Curated annotation (Swiss-Prot):
The lineage of its organism: Eukaryota, Viridiplantae, Streptophyta, Embryophyta, Tracheophyta. It comes from Arabidopsis thaliana (Mouse-ear cress). This is Probable E3 ubiquitin-protein ligase ARI11. A zinc finger (IBR-type) spans 208-271. Might act as an E3 ubiquitin-protein ligase, or as part of E3 complex, which accepts ubiquitin from specific E2 ubiquitin-conjugating enzymes and then transfers it to substrates. Its EC number is 2.3.2.31. Belongs to the RBR family. Ariadne subfamily. Zn(2+) 6 binds at residues 325, 328, 335, 338.
Length: 542
């Protein structure tokens, strides 16, 4: 089965890994030396793309460990070697050239084998005589004479001593992943250097580095896998599309990211909006907007001047020294009063527009940044809760930690909701940046209503987890506090908040065209938290 046709397995965060932890004592394919590939090891032999398949109504992806990547590589190498009747070393060269796309390789090979051989550097016959009778052979690099055993060649037959081969290949490995496609040292020769030569002449540390590049090439050169961007994580994610617009995936290291752009998970906001927003946060253009909004140019030298006192009599700094009125920008020497109405000139209009743009951007950015910092704080609180405080609560309440998992669920829900809420402000910023028409105002109103409901629910949940729950941790417990009531309250708030945000995400994914909580979607809140109606209805203006 080719890599391009391989099925993808669905995975949900928190479930057990789909692969076994088989041994990784791997034997070289041909030489028998230790290497990354073998039939002798049992690296994830239970890997089965059919097992544990979840409904295709959700996005399909699978988190893959390095040993599983090795097995997938080995399977592709063996398939190509069998189908094309070439050695496994040549299979590796071909797969690297075709970026591990087995189907494309096989199609083009059977269409024009000779052209493919020449393109990748696999020669059928050497270009120099390798069957001579001379005892000593001159190295093509150092020009010293060596015995046949001290000389090594690739398919072209050009002779080089093993010492020169070692230096040549080691230099290529130190240069980076380009070492996977090393050619013969002869400048005019296009013959490729295979893994058999790498194994023969390189030291262990260089060989390990080479095979590290080789392993990573399966993910980085292909189109279906990407490495988890979390620092230190060695998992990759294989992805398949089933019609959903979200690319968010959850790695086994617990890091959630967008598979498409490799930024933090940002559903339901699309990658383009995220890219524009992050770029805007770094863009120096906001500095120019601030200058336009908060300063006026000196009428004489045109340098921007910020007014920092109450008086309208302004003096430009040296060497200009121009005196003028801040209100009307006229020289003070012939200035009487500037209380007559004057229509805004072009510069004043620009300043007002710049100030409006800054105020609008600041409004959304502050809320985006607040939810980001709140999310990071919640992640820190969860870590502290799981490592210290959960055990304290378990001891105080004489309850197993497994029965207190609802507290962890609450914190996880808070973290996820902060993430979603953060990106709604980036989404909202670009809605208001569009043409002012009825549809845009309707979408803005819908977003405001949905996010307000969700944010209010989140704040109540966050307060309960951060303040009320922690009141039950300490050396002395207030007997007036009823932990059972808090348990029910926290569970209800977690469910209600989850429903709010599911509706918000659905509304954003649908473009806020159909935003309504009907009777079947009513959200019931704990009576202790609100006196308002338990059923809310939101309708758009569209």
């Amino acid at each position: 089965m080719s890599s391009s046709d391989r099925d993808i397995i669905d995975i949900e965060s928190g479930e057990e890994d789909l692969y076994s932890d088989g041994g990784n004592d791997i034997i070289d394919i041909e030489s028998g030396e230790e290497d990354l590939y073998s039939d002798g090891g049992n690296v994830s032999d239970d890997y089965n793309p059919v097992d544990d398949t979840i409904s295709r109504s959700e996005k399909s992806y699978v988190v893959v460990k390095e040993e599983d990547i090795l097995k997938l590589q080995r399977d592709d190498i063996e398939q190509v070697s069998t189908v094309l009747s070439v050695s496994q070393v040549e299979s590796i060269v071909l797969l690297l050239h075709y970026h591990w796309c087995v189907s494309k390789l096989e199609d083009e090979w059977f269409t024009d084998e000779e052209r493919i051989r020449k393109t990748v550097g696999i020669l059928k016959e050497p270009v120099v005589d390798v069957n001579g009778t001379e005892v000593d052979i001159q190295c093509g690099i150092c020009f010293e004479s060596y015995t046949r055993k001290e000389i090594a060649r690739v398919s072209c037959g050009h002779p080089y001593c093993k010492t020169c081969w070692t230096g040549y290949i080691t230099t290529k490995i130190e240069d980076g992943p380009g070492c996977l496609r090393v050619k013969c040292p002869e400048p005019s020769c296009y013959a490729v250097v295979g893994q058999d030569m790498i194994d023969e002449v390189t030291e262990k540390k260089d060989k390990d580095k080479y095979y590290r590049y080789f392993l990573r090439s399966y993910v980085e050169d292909g189109k279906k896998m990407k490495w988890c961007p979390s620092p230190g994580c060695e998992y990759a994610v294989e992805f398949g599309v089933n019609g959903s617009s979200s690319y968010d995936v959850s790695c086994l290291c617990s890091y959630k990211f967008c598979w498409n752009c490799c930024e933090d998970a940002h559903s339901p906001v699309d990658c383009e909006t995220v890219s524009k927003w992050l770029l805007k946060n770094k863009d120096e253009s906001e500095n120019m907007n601030w200058i336009l909004a908060k300063t006026k140019p000196c009428p004489k030298c045109k340098r921007p001047i910020e007014k920092n006192t109450g008086c309208n009599h302004m003096s430009c700094s040296a060497p200009c020294r121009h005196y003028f009125c801040w209100a009307c920008l006229q020289p003070l020497s012939d200035h009487k009063a500037c209380n007559a109405f004057k229509a805004d000139n072009e510069d004043e209009t620009k300043r007002k527009r710049a100030k409006d743009a800054i105020d609008r951007y600041t409004h959304f950015y502050e809320r985006w940044a607040f939810n980001q910092s709140s999310r990071l704080k919640a992640m820190s609180d969860l870590e502290k809760w799981q490592s210290v405080e959960l055990k304290q609560l378990s001891d105080i309440q004489s309850t197993p930690e497994t029965q207190l998992s609802f507290t962890v669920d609450a914190w996880l829900q808070i973290i996820e909701c902060r993430r979603v809420l953060k990106w709604t402000y980036a989404y909202g910023y670009y809605i208001l940046s569009q043409e002012r028409n009825k549809r845009v105002f309707a979408r803005t109103f819908s977003l405001s209503c949905c996010s307000a409901e969700a944010e209010n629910g989140l704040e109540r949940l966050h307060h309960c987890a951060e303040e009320e729950l922690k009141q039950f941790i300490g050396k002395i417990e207030d007997p007036s506090k009823n932990f059972g009531e808090l348990r029910a309250k926290l569970i209800d708030l977690t469910k209600a908040t989850k429903t709010y945000f599911e509706n918000l995400v659905k509304a954003l994914e649908n473009g806020l065209v159909d935003v309504a909580y009907n009777e079947s979607q009513s959200i019931e809140e704990p009576e202790s938290f609100t006196k308002r109606s338990k059923t809310r209805k939101i309708k758009t203006l569209i």
